[in-house]
Amino acid sequence: MKIKSDYSNEPQWKEVNVKSSLPKELACLDEIAHNLWYGWTHEARSLFTHLDEELYEKVGHNPVLLLEQLSYDRKEAIVKDKDLMKRVKNVYKMFKDYMNVKPNAKRPSVAYFCMEFGLNQVLKIYSGGLGMLAGDYLKEASDSNVDLCAVGFLYRYGYFRQSLSMDGQQIAKYDAQIFNSLPIERVLDADGNQMVVDVPYTNYMVHALVWQVNVGRIKLYLLDTDNDMNSEFDRPITHALYGGDWENRIKQEILLGIGGILTLKKLGIKKDIYHCNEGHAALCNLQRLCDYVEQGLTFNQAMELVRASSLYTVHTPVPAGHDYFDEALFNKYMSGYPEKLGISWDEFIGMGRTNPDDHSERFCMSTFACNTSQEINGVSRLHGWVSQKMFAPLWKGYFPEENHVGYVTNGVHLPTWTATEWRKVYAANFDDNFMSDQSNENIWHAIYNVPDEEIWNTRMALKNKLIKYIRDKFTQQWLRNQGDPAKVVSILEKINPNALMIGFCRRFATYKRAHLLFTDLERLEKIVNNPERPVLFFFSGKAHPADGAGQGLIKRIFEISQMPQFLGKIIFLEDYDMELARCLVSGVDIWMNTPTRPLEASGTSGEKAEMNGVVNLSVLDGWWVEGYRKGAGWALPEKRTYQNQEYQDKLDAATIYSLLENEITPLFFNKTKGKTYSADWVKVVKNSIATIAPHYTMKRQLDDYYSKFYDKQAERSAKLHANDNRLAKEIALWKETVAERWDSINVIDSNFDALNNAVTGKVTTLTFTIDEQGLQDAVGLELVVLNNTPVDDVNIHKVLPFKLVKTEGNLYTFQLDFDASDAGAFKCAVRMYPKNSLLPHRQDFAYVKWLN
């Protein structure tokens, strides 16, 4: 027998998790480490630091890794250290006292779905503002003690880490997360195995492992497809945030929406409200429709129940920012659902189209979310108005300002983003109930009682803290990128805490106009190099790997930062993450934001700055439209002067230069006699904290969601579900009847032409007699009066309802006494609409007939 040179079978690897053992006295630390409460609790973070400060830095402030890597000798030393053990017991008591508070049963329960969550820098399942907002929301839900759970993804690679080449080119690096070293837990089934959710895709299943993140009292469930049960084509579904092609995107959104609901069902969780944070999660409503139909309800009855309990929050201000799928791709994965729902394919795909009968139109997740959610909201007052216009084509019988799209302005989680130094100032000077009453401006006004010197010293301490962080973290990166050690030393020497320090840190999308400051380099050079009034700019942020223009902006800023006149004055900090963000929003003097109007949906980084006495300089867009107060920051005008964007950019740049030269730097450097600081600047800081900060906390945002949406939706949903869904069935039947007869409803008689003789001071009585075709008072009439402006600039003058004055069989007579109080040219038309007190708003059943 010939001996082979190689002979081996394949090993069957078994995953074995060997945990580092802790002495029983320290076992409680593992419990704290696996709850992100530690991340917004100073006492817990400080405790982990003191266990082994050098190691805690080395593991990136990851307490799970810290406990794993603590040496045996160090563990023994901790147990013997009475003072340290006393701190361990005190922090654990704080934690247990916090966790033992029961949720407020009076407030509706919520299931919250989002593609990303920014909870801390250790758990890399976020990319930008959407994730930051969602993470802060869960933390505040915990602090506010509400009954909420959330669903997202456990990304193997998360969002990329950023570095810059020597010429400033962005390099994206994807590091695999080692799940066992993260502050997360496996969700176990009844047999003690990790729970698996089987998610149906056309003709096959995707198997998702379920993980749990403890966010204080809140549970966040994360789905993970990177396992051996799935094919090589499906394992990458949860590899990267916003990674892959459109096919991977639809697979992600099926997993989040449909898989998310199946996960909650398997866990036995049912909530009052289902909140889709962006359109990515819209298919959760599809699975809920299927569940109700499976229980024996018709599609229309199921839709009443799903809509009543669904809220969709949009974060995107332009239609191009939403997800659209070609019909062929959508059909590939969703072809089985019409049969499950008892409707046709055209009816099904039509729910994701603005024009359902247009077969060339792609399926839009945001449109589907609108059509399956009772309520919709933008994320600032301005963005609410932008969203009304954006979604107006869905309800063609109504003008944008008439539709039901509302808003809740974003806020930020105060304990996460407020530096410890400021929290001490607030604790010493504000009321004891401050944290439970964060929106009370009267409490914040106590900042005026804090001595100016204490305010200034707090600011200087945080500026120096930022500079130390930069020197510690970035020196090696700069040596690598810039080659010349002398240049790096020069940069470090020029970072002066006494300079006016300005931050511009955010996602590098072109609409955010990071280039604006560099429109006139000569003028900028004079500003940053004024020996009496030195100014320093910090830039940081990532561009999407597919966004060449955004990467070009980063490269250009880096190139400018290397010019001799800007060296150490314009500084780009790589790999913007939560840790760096916390240092910047508390460590600079001014937070600058220059988006193209009105493309900033909200923007929360400036709100974080407000909590830390950092003053905003921003275009009046997003949250700053509401937040700006004179004497508490600076604003560029909300209205555009030029339609030509290049001209507008030049004007805005000139405005920024002028503000810096003539207002901001003189104010900052005008030291009060006998002081080392400007009392006038401190006054601006105090005004900012007292009058702006109270209105932009996550506490206020959460309370707004309850008062504006959750409470009323939960109340209505409960009524629809009562008595075997009686009201839901009643409303569905009524809508079906109205829809069936709508086209046959007609005008028998009217005197609409009497409007031709309308004059001011005289009442004109209009009368319409309608044959309702046996519907029994199911329609309403109103006169819509528009100001006579160009067709593309609709401006409602007034809307006047008709009164029902006579009923005779199927004939209903409506009357309106029209008092023409204003002279001028107007456009008038009569609108007929379905009328039912059980409807939450008109767009819930947006049938309209103009009685021309």
PLM segments and residue spans:
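Catalytic cores of carbohydrate-active enzymes across secretory and cytosolic contexts
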Residues: 1-852
